[in-house]
Amino acid sequence: LLASSAASDVYKRQIVEGLVKVDQATLNGETKEATKTVNESGEAYNTKDLLNRCYVYRGTVVCSGEAYMEVKVVGDKTLFGELALEVQEDTRETPLQVKLAKLAKQISTFGYIGAIAIVVGVFARTLLGGNIPNTFMEWVNLSIEAITVAVTIIVCAVPEGLPMLTSILLSYQSMRMAKDNVLVHKINGLETAGSLSLLFSDKTGTITEGKLSVVEVATGNVRKFSSMKELPLPLKDEVTIGIGLNNSSSYSNGSIIGGNSTDRALMSFLVDAGVDANVAREDVRNFNAFDSAKKYSTVTINHNGKVVTYIKGAPERIIARCQTYLDENGAVKPLTERNFLMTYMDEQAGRSMRLLGVAKCDGDTADGEGLTLVCVLAIRDNVRKEAVDAIREVQEAGIQVVMVTGDRKETAVAIAKEAGLLKHNTDVALTSAELAELSDDELKKVLPNLRVVSRALPTDKSRLVRCAQELNLVVGMTGDGVNDSPALKKADVGFAMGSGTEVAKEAGDITILDDNFLSIEKAILYGRTMFKSIRKFLIFQLTVNVAAVLTCFLAPLFGENEILTVIQLLVVNLAMDTLAAIAFGSEPALMEYMKEKPIARDASIVTGKMMSQVVVSGLYITAMCLCIRFVPALQHLLGAWSTGVLDTTLLNSAVFATFMMAISFNGFNARTEHTNPFEHLGRNKNFLLVIGALLVLQFLFVTFGGAVLSVEPLSWTAWLVCLLIAFLIIPIDIIRKAITSKKK
């Protein structure tokens, strides 16, 4: 087998002869090739541990070597089969679904109580007012009138626009998120991303770049350079030959081909700096690929009229044979400060760097002493620069980030420190073996301080998700391999990587197209924006409900059984529900949302602050509607006595107009928690269009509604009075917000 996919239907094959190097990235996401050979010791291996040395798994790619293998497992007993069974199960209820179910019960209770109160109010007003029906039909008509209004209130209490809002939010946010390399294919993923309290993230490709790259070049006197462009020209030429020609990969037609991951990283280091990596390739006399026994590779070339051999390999072996080194200006100097150089190498190893030494000598052999050190290169799958900032911002948002990797503990800890995950003495890093020694109860105690899990197995991810969810945490999981799919499915929100397998993408809720942690942060921000928009809509809609119930309940006590007709209430319900969904579905994603703590899974979607806003606004609208209908001063101002007889139809028309306009203006209050109701208004043009449409519709309803809506046209004076009363809801709420903010 050479550079081929390992099998079609098998789970694992045991090597019986030979040695191969295998890329297992499709299963564990790690870029480092795994060596597989015969189990000569007869030692028993955990067959589900992808790091074992004698089993080759389906879906992996053989990069080099030859081997005979014995098929061990097929069918639904395979890893693929087991994963497929686990992925099929999907019984999750999202945090938002839990909150909305709780809210639905509360709204239903409020609606039923309000409906009963209205029926009681109508009958009480009739009986106490002395207008007791004389005939059976009068009783029937009174009952029908009261029950009709009550049923209408129940209908109005249900926020029918909420499903439309979530659909609009998903489509609108999805378009914006696609531009940020985030693809949403399950709506519950976007809902839940905003409530995350714990995120398990892969290391390779997510926190790191996902490929090896040269981080630093150091000379024998430890002069350090971070790129080829920084190297002085004499040293630059030597490094170019030392790693460009002594390399199994090559650069052709804009692509780096061949070689292992280390050789490709060295070639990329040259290409990215605009260096011609193929320079003087025609001068190559002999090339010896990496020898595992000698721990180095060599290339012999004709250089400046003489034969020179360049050596690249394990730095400790190469430096031990060096007597001199090239300084930054290309001058040959005695290598006397070996301890200084070795200290530097130890420091880099502590940062999980893979070190390579490059040396040269005259002649066509490199077996002797007296080498000249060209440089030492530090290579690593480097931390993404943007990931460090993104991790910090996610942590500031109250979300715990845990890096889960198949890499060794030392490497994982070094990366975690650089990424900002390990900052305190209380932070914990565990290996898979250490994790397995903990009981579930012990793991739950450690979990709040857990930051790194190394040598992780697929079962570790699923267990971490389960224990975190038992602590009532909202859990996110990233993954790219087939073995990640159960954990992606079990997590509250699964982030599949764009470069990952189709199985992982199918199991996840959101696909991160560029595999970047920064994009995960953006997904969380958009999720929080969606949740905020739902809350804004609920403030708006619940205010309508409270105002409608209170107005219809109190009006009969003042002598008006039907201050808002059934048709008017249905018009309000239809217009406010549907158009409000459009208005709040386009709210901008504000970074201030990332400064807030996550919302608990079982927390109510309606907070006390929201209820205070709903109650104050609802009471104001109710009070103004009752004042318009029953206060003589306002009646005269509206022109209801212009004929000498009280025009109740005109007053009810003014009530209807004021009710709808006040609700419309309350949208400005609902869309922000701050005292300025007009902030960021330019970033949601749909909101302005909807409010404008509602005001125009209200004018048309009252002017042309006639007998259908039980209204009559208002004078311009009456319209101005109604408009002023309705607009006052904005300063009223500004005062409320100022008072409540001082109490914090």
Region locations from a protein language model:
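Transmembrane alpha-helix/helix-exit interface in multi-pass inner-membrane proteins
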Residues: 622-630
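Conserved cytosolic headpiece of P-type ATPases
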Residues: 1, 5-598, 602-606, 619, ...
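A C-terminal functional module that forms or caps the active site or interfaces directly
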Residues: 670
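Helix-coil boundary and interhelical linker segments in multi-pass alpha-helical membrane proteins
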Residues: 556-565, 630-650
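Generic alpha-helical transmembrane segments
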Residues: 576, 622, 652-667
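Membrane-water interface at loop-to-transmembrane-helix junctions
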Residues: 600-619, 645-653
